[in-house]
C-alpha cells in the first residue's frame, strides 16, 4: 500500500509535474502543479472531490515528480508525458495525425499540391484543412480557375509535349517552351495565391482590369478567355461561406458529452472562410469536467510541433478554463506570436460557436448510435461463442498474385472497434508459391511465437478460410513454446459461402467443435464480416504496395552498379519506371552519375 505520509514529507513546494504509477509500474495519471506539495496533498484528504479521484488514488503504488522552472514549462511537460505514457486516468486525444495543407512551391514554375507533415519544402503553405478530401476539392477548384501545374517534378522535367491537363485548359504547360511565358504563368500563380489567402475581390479586380486591357488591344479571344475566368471565380465566391466581419485565423471548439462519450468539434476558419470541420472522440475518464476536458484537449491538440500542426491567432472555446493564461503563454511561445484563447464570444464569432455546438451534438448522436450497435454486435458474438467477455479479437488474411509477393495481414478489434495502431502486415517468404496454408502458419508464428503482455492476448482469432486453414492454425498453436496462455484464444475459421457472397459464410468453431450457419441479418455475423473485410482490405493494400515496389525495382535491382541512389536518380530524371524502359541508350547515359558503360548494361537488362 502506498505510504502517502512519508512520500509527502519529501515533496517540495516548487512548480512541476507528477506521474502516478500502479502496482505494475504503469503510469496511470500525469498532472502538473504550481505547488507540487499542495497539489499532491489534496489527493490524500479524507473527502475527495470525485469518484474518479477516489479510483485513481486507490490504484497508486508510487509517485514520481519533476520540478520545473515555471508553471508554463510544467504545462508543456505534462502534455509531453501524457502523449508518451497514454495514462488511463487522463483525457487522451486518439487522433494524432498531422493536417493536410496546400503547398505552393518556390520554383521557376511553381507547383501547387497537397502536403502533409513537417514543412521542409520551400514555398507557401495554406491551411490547415480538416480532411484530405477538402484539399482535393480545393485543388480541383483551383485547376478550373487558374492553369497552374500540379505534376511532380519528375514528370515536369521530362515532358517533350504538353499533357492532357493542357488540352482541357487546366494547365498552362510551362514544362514545354513556347506555350506560356514566365511572366504570364507567374501572374496566374499570384492570382491563385490571392485566392488561397481569401482575397477574392482583388482577384476579380485584377481579372477585370486585364479583360479591359485585352478589349482595348482588340484581343477579343483573350478578353473572352478572361471573361470566362471571371465568371468561374464569381460562381465560386457565391458558394463559399464568407464572414461579413473580418476575422482572424481561428479555430472554434465545442464539446458535447453524453453516456460516457465526448465529441470535440473543431471548426477551422482562415481569412474569414470556414475551411471545414472535424470531430474528435477523446478517451475521457469518468467524472471528468468539461472544463478539464477542454483544457487538456487544447494542450494535446496544439502542442504537437512535430506534426506540423498550425496554431491559429485565436482559439474560441465554450467552457471556462482555469489555466487559460498559462495555455495562452505556452501557445504564444510555440507559435512565435500572440495567441488568444477566448471563452466568451459576441457577434459573428458567437454564430460560429453555435454552429460548432450543433455539429458537435449531431456527431455525438451518430457516434452513440454506432457505439450502441457495436456493443449489441459484441454481445451477440459473445452469446454464440459462449464467452463471458471479448476484449480483443484478431483476424488474419493472405493476399498474393499467382503466388507472388505474398502478404499476410492481421487486424485487431476491441470493444471500441478497429484498433488500427495494432494492425500488422507480414512479408511471407520461403514457401511454395500459392501455398496459403504455409503462409498462414508463417504469419501466426511471426505474430504469436514470442512473449505477449496479458492485454495483447486475443480472446478470439478469426482465420479467413475453411477447415484446412483452421486445422493448420490449430497445429501451429499447438507447437508454440510460449509462457502466455496459448489456449486462451478461441480460433474460428470463416469459410466463404457459395459464390463467395457475403451473408453465406460458414463459421467453424474450434473449441465447440461445431459449424454454424448464421442468418444474414444476425448481429454477430455483421461484426465478423466487418472484421474479415477489414483484414482483407488491409492485406490487399499491403500486397499492392509490395507489387508496385517490385515493379519499380524490376530490371534495375539486378544491374551491377545500380544501387538505391542511382535507381532513384534514374526514376526521377526519366519520369518513372515506364520512362526508364522507353528511354534510348543516349537518354540513359545523359542521366547524372550514369556512365556510357553502365547505361549499356541498364539498356540491355531492360530488354532481356
From Swiss-Prot:
Entry keyword annotation includes DNA damage: yes
Subcellular localization, as worded in the UniProt entry: Cytoplasm
CDD domains cross-referenced by the UniProt entry: GIY-YIG_UvrC_Cho
GO molecular function ontology, one term from the record: DNA binding
GO CC annotations on file: cytoplasm; excinuclease repair complex
Keywords carried by this UniProt record: Cytoplasm, DNA damage, DNA excision, DNA repair, Excision nuclease, SOS response
SMART domains: GIYc, HhH1
UniProt key word Cytoplasm: yes
SUPFAM superfamilies cross-referenced by the UniProt entry: C-terminal UvrC-binding domain of UvrB, GIY-YIG endonuclease, RuvA domain 2-like
InterPro entries on file: GIY-YIG_endonuc, GIY-YIG_endonuc_sf, GIY-YIG_UvrC_Cho, Hlx-hairpin-Hlx_DNA-bd_motif, RuvA_2-like, UVR_dom, UVR_dom_sf, UvrABC_protein_C
Domain (GIY-YIG) ranges: 13-91
Domain UVR: residue ranges: 201-236
Biological processes annotated in GO: nucleotide-excision repair; SOS response
Subunit structure: Interacts with UvrB in an incision complex.
PANTHER family: UVRABC SYSTEM PROTEIN C (PTHR30562:SF1), UVRC/OXIDOREDUCTASE (PTHR30562)
Family, similarity comment: Belongs to the UvrC family.
Its job: The UvrABC repair system catalyzes the recognition and processing of DNA lesions. UvrC both incises the 5' and 3' sides of the lesion. The N-terminal half is responsible for the 3' incision and the C-terminal half is responsible for the 5' incision.
Name of protein: UvrABC system protein C
Species per Swiss-Prot/TrEMBL record: Pasteurella multocida (strain Pm70)
Amino acid at each position: 500500500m502506498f505510504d502517502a505520509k512519508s512520500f509527502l514529507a519529501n515533496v517540495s513546494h516548487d512548480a512541476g509535474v507528477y506521474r502516478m504509477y500502479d502496482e505494475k509500474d504503469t503510469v496511470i495519471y500525469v498532472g502538473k502543479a504550481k505547488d507540487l506539495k499542495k497539489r499532491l496533498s489534496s489527493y490524500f484528504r479524507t473527502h475527495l472531490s470525485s469518484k474518479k479521484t477516489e479510483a485513481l488514488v486507490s490504484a497508486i503504488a508510487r509517485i514520481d515528480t519533476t520540478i520545473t522552472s515555471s508553471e508554463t514549462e510544467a504545462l508543456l511537460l505534462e502534455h509531453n508525458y501524457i502523449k508518451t505514457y497514454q495514462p488511463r486516468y487522463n483525457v487522451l486525444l486518439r487522433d494524432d495525425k498531422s493536417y493536410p495543407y496546400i503547398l505552393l512551391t518556390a520554383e521557376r514554375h511553381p507547383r501547387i499540391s497537397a502536403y502533409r507533415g513537417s514543412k521542409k519544402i520551400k514555398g507557401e503553405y495554406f491551411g490547415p484543412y480538416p480532411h484530405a478530401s477538402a484539399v482535393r476539392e480545393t485543388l480541383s477548384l483551383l485547376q478550373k480557375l487558374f492553369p497552374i501545374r500540379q505534376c511532380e517534378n519528375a514528370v515536369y522535367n521530362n515532358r517533350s509535349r504538353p499533357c492532357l491537363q493542357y488540352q482541357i485548359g487546366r494547365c498552362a504547360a510551362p514544362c514545354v517552351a513556347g506555350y506560356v511565358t514566365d511572366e504570364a504563368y507567374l501572374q496566374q500563380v499570384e492570382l491563385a495565391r490571392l485566392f488561397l489567402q481569401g482575397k477574392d475581390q482583388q482577384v476579380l479586380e485584377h481579372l477585370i482590369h486585364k479583360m479591359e486591357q485585352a478589349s482595348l488591344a482588340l484581343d477579343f479571344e483573350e478578353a473572352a478567355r478572361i471573361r470566362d475566368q471571371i465568371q468561374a471565380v464569381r460562381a465560386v465566391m457565391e458558394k463559399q461561406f464568407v464572414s461579413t466581419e473580418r476575422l482572424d485565423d481561428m479555430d472554434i471548439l465545442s464539446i458535447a458529452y453524453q453516456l460516457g462519450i465526448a465529441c470535440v468539434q473543431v471548426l477551422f476558419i482562415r481569412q474569414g472562410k470556414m475551411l471545414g470541420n472535424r470531430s474528435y472522440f477523446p478517451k475521457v475518464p469518468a467524472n471528468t469536467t468539461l472544463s478539464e476536458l477542454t483544457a487538456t484537449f487544447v494542450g494535446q491538440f496544439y502542442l504537437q510541433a512535430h506534426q506540423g500542426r498550425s496554431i491559429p491567432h485565436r482559439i474560441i472555446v465554450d467552457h471556462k478554463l482555469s489555466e487559460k493564461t498559462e495555455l495562452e503563454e505556452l501557445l504564444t511561445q510555440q507559435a512565435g506570436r500572440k495567441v488568444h484563447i477566448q471563452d466568451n464570444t459576441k457577434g459573428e464569432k458567437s454564430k460560429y460557436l453555435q454552429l460548432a455546438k450543433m455539429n458537435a451534438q449531431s456527431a455525438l448522436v451518430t457516434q452513440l448510435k454506432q457505439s450502441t450497435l457495436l456493443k449489441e454486435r459484441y454481445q451477440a458474438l459473445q452469446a454464440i461463442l459462449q464467452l463471458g467477455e471479448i476484449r480483443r479479437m484478431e483476424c488474419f488474411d493472405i493476399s498474393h498474385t499467382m503466388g507472388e509477393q505474398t502478404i499476410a495481414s492481421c487486424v485487431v478489434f476491441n470493444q471500441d472497434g478497429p484498433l488500427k495502431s495494432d494492425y500488422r502486415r507480414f512479408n511471407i517468404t520461403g514457401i511454395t508459391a500459392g501455398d496459403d496454408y504455409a503462409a498462414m502458419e508463417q504469419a501466426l508464428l511471426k505474430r504469436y511465437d514470442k512473449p505477449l503482455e496479458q492485454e495483447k492476448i486475443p480472446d478470439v482469432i478469426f482465420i479467413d478460410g475453411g477447415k484446412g486453414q483452421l486445422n493448420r492454425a490449430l497445429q501451429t498453436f499447438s507447437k508454440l513454446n510460449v509462457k502466455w496462455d496459448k489456449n486462451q484464444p478461441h480460433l474460428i475459421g470463416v469459410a466463404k459461402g457459395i459464390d463467395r457472397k457475403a451473408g453465406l459464410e460458414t463459421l467453424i468453431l474450434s473449441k465447440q467443435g461445431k459449424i454454424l450457419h448464421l442468418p444474414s441479418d444476425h448481429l454477430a455475423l455483421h461484426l465478423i464480416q466487418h472484421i474479415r473485410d477489414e483484414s482483407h482490405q488491409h492485406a490487399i493494400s499491403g500486397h499492392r504496395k509490395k507489387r508496385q515496389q517490385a515493379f519499380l525495382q524490376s530490371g534495375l535491382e539486378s544491374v551491377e552498379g545500380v544501387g538505391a541512389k542511382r535507381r532513384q536518380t534514374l526514376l526521377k530524371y526519366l519520369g518513372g519506371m515506364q520512362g526508364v524502359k522507353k528511354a534510348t541508350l543516349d537518354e540513359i547515359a545523359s542521366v547524372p552519375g550514369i556512365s556510357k558503360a553502365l547505361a549499356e548494361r541498364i539498356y540491355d537488362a531492360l530488354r532481356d
